[in-house]
Swiss-Prot record:
Keywords attached to this entry: DNA replication, DNA-directed RNA polymerase, Magnesium, Manganese, Metal-binding, Nucleotidyltransferase, Primosome, Transcription, Transferase
InterPro entries for this protein: DNA_primase_S, DNA_primase_ssu_PriS
UniProt-annotated catalytic positions: 95, 97, 281
GO molecular function, one term: DNA-directed RNA polymerase activity
Assembly mode: Heterodimer of a small subunit (PriS) and a large subunit (PriL).
Signal peptide: none
Lineage: Archaea, Nitrososphaerota, Nitrososphaeria, Nitrosopumilales, Nitrosopumilaceae
Co-factor requirement: Mg(2+); Mn(2+)
Gene Ontology cellular-component terms listed: DNA-directed RNA polymerase complex; primosome complex
EC number: 2.7.7.-
Pfam families xrefs: DNA_primase_S (PF01896)
Top-rank taxon: Archaea
Source organism of this protein record: Nitrosopumilus maritimus (strain SCM1)
Protein name, per record: DNA primase small subunit PriS
Enzymatic class: transferase
Amino acid sequence: MNETDIKFLESAFKKYYFEQFELIRVPERTSEREFGYQKFNSGMTRHISVKDDKELHLLLMQNVPSDVYCSNAYYSFPNLPMNEKDWKEADLIFDIDAKDLNLSCRGNHTLSICNECHEISNNSEKCSKCNSTKLEKKSLPCKNCIDSSKIEVKKLSEILTNDLSVNKDDIQVYFSGNEGFHIYVYNSQFQQNGSRERSELVDYIMFNGAIPEKFGMKKFKPNRNSFPDFDEAGWKGRFSKYVYGSKSKRSKIVSELLSNGYSSFQKTLDDVSENIGTKIDPNVTMDIHRIFRLPGSINSKSGLTKIHCKDLVKFDAYVDSSFLSDDSVEVLANCPIEFKLKNKKFGPYHNEKVSVPTFAAVYMVCKKLATIA
């Protein structure tokens, strides 16, 4: 990214952190957290300890980071190297991202940027100008991406509350600022769980590794009465609703499952996992030393804010997370796909000078689809 673009983004971000600091969620037990940040065109700075909101505000104003992070873990010495921090416990965090959902819409709003000649083309594997295969993919997520991610959030929330006895008031959902959601679970029975236990939790939520015997099927002499019933709790109930369809079809479907045999039943379980298992990023939840994007901070992939979703159904990602200025900026835009922010449509642009609001200019510059003119 060139110096002019960096200065433009830093100016917009600094104005945000000066005017909108109340949107930053300063985490509880602040002094026990590890903070980190990145600057534009620079690496990560980690192992920072912050005492309170004043220190955090000072850090933001002095450094004007592209991205700000905070640990889900609590440490005795958060500013020391990892093996000296003395890990106490960690909040449970889940990451749901549209890019992991295999959505059919993805190809329609994904662009390929050539790292050799900087040509921008619609989702391709080879540059149309110089034939290079060194391409960077950029997505401009659509409403379907967000709506599909919301469905996964709802599935996750139901499992947490119904199966795992998590109090719904201890679950907080945040839009990531780009194309997904971060789900935080506080004060739960899982606070002191290590990576291995969290891995087992992930498998349960995603319905990974389910074995036929747990659902009534045996290699030898299976008993039809052992198969799940429609009204059972947890995954047995979900299995029943998905596989049988209705109570009246249970007997017929069980007969078919018995007839098809053990190996076929395993494929049925795999199908259940693929279709109704919650699609979370397992590595995020298992990592008890990770630092996460700070709620209320700007996501440098978009210029949008990681924001708390008080009402997930009504939440409009590309309106409710856009807080940058409406002031007009002239950019040289090469964005061949239309996008929508704050209920306004922008693009497509083909190597042309256009005047757009700052929030739209930042969005395109962050995605390498425009430069300051």
